[in-house]
Amino acid sequence: MPFDHAHWQERFDALRTEHHVPGAALAVFVDGDLHELASGVLHRGTGVAVTTDSVFQSGSVAKVYTATLVMQLVDAGELRLDTRVADVLPGFAVADAEVARTVTIGRLLSHTSGIAGDFTLDTGRGDDCLARFVDACADVGQDCPPDTVISYCSTGYAILGRIVEVLTGQSWDDALRDRLFTPLGLHQSMTLPEEALRFRVAMSHLGELGTDPEPAPVWDMLPRSAGPYGRVLITAADVVRFARMHLDDGVAPDGTRVLSAASAALMRQQVAGCLDTWSFMATGWGHGWALYDWDGVPGYGHDGASGGQFSYLRVVPGSGVVAALLTNGGVATSFFTDLFRELLGELAGVRMPEVFAPPAEPRPIDVAPLAGTYEREGGAP
């Protein structure tokens, strides 16, 4: 079905307002064409409008970029999925010595290492930030044993970023620029705040659900060491261009092969299923991509969150549709869900599941036996 720009702009504006999202950008690739929409403001304090070339923070969508760099190294023969981290990073340590000795690249890519995932540490702005971060992982424990379940692990992606540095001889930032941004023509994608100053940049907003949020106290809440798992600075169109390369099995729009077809397929081949499909909205995970099953229609993508900004990327290979939504606050997940249920339903024939919520008439449950203090490794009680 042709993309009706006026209709989708109207729905985009209405749903953004309904869900108190200050500003958003949307890019959709369908029937061989790229369509871009913008709505709202970059900063509620200044009133500067969002445009289609505005730059937002990616959050965890950055993980797919890092996974792609790793799979390029697999293509080059520098790595295998069963390569042990310790074989690339001598002296690598986490709290569990056996995990440190045996954990593999594949387990980090697929979130099946069991390593505690939310270890965050500001190791400075220098090019040594990832090396210092990995050194500091020696006391990081396990959320669960390896290969037990999907245990979402940002820590593992920082470690993968350091592996990219060691094998390329470049910083992660430079490797990303030279190996992905440049060959794909992603001219408005970057990793550092000073690079983003050249463009119209979205400010994060924070506030109570159901109210119009206010600008965050600072623009960037992540340290540089978070780059491989959480900080690529992007436009919606650039995200779609990146995902199109995966849709086309590793080939850029100009015909340049960026990734082998085999590696592109491995990234979206399920390694493990999600037990908690409500939190992730995914049915499983590959070597980088979150995987979806929309009533029998397969897809892949990733979500991201970064201090008040939220990003959503979905690919429907059967219909050749790619869509990316970037937002700067508000009830973004509800905005995404309502918009993409309509958008993918019309353009890709996808029926997304209803949002997980309590039943209209919940039955009484005695919660007394469940009361207590719960704690997970790497997190507060």
Swiss-Prot record:
Q: Which family does the record claim for this protein?
A: Belongs to the beta-lactamase family.
Q: Which domain of life is it from?
A: Bacteria
User: So where does this one cross the membrane?
Assistant: 271-291, 315-340
Q: Which InterPro entries match?
A: Bact_CellWall_Synth/Modif, Beta-lactam-related, Beta-lactam/transpept-like
Tell me, what is an example of a GO biological process annotation in this record?
regulation of cell shape
What keywords is this UniProt entry annotated with?
A: Cell membrane, Cell shape, Cell wall biogenesis/degradation, Membrane, NAD, Peptidoglycan synthesis, Transmembrane, Transmembrane helix
Sorted alphabetically, the Gene Ontology cellular component annotations on this record are: plasma membrane
Locate the residues binding NAD(+).
G299, Y300, G301, H302, D303, G304, A305, S306, G307, G308
Q: How does it sit in the membrane?
A: Multi-pass membrane protein
**First-listed, main subcellular location of the protein, grouped into a coarse class:** membrane
Intracellular or extracellular location(s): Cell membrane
Q: What is this protein called?
A: Penicillin-binding protein 4
Q: What organism does this protein naturally occur in?
A: Amycolatopsis lactamdurans
PANTHER family associated with the record: BETA-LACTAMASE-RELATED DOMAIN-CONTAINING PROTEIN (PTHR46825:SF9), D-ALANYL-D-ALANINE-CARBOXYPEPTIDASE/ENDOPEPTIDASE AMPH (PTHR46825)
Q: What Gene3D superfamilies does this protein map onto?
A: DD-peptidase/beta-lactamase superfamily (3.40.710.10)
Biological role stated in the UniProt entry = Involved in cell wall biosynthesis and may also act as a sensor of external penicillins.
Q: Does the keyword Nucleotide-binding apply?
A: no
Active site, UniProt feature: S60
Pfam families to which the protein is assigned, alphabetical:
Beta-lactamase (PF00144)
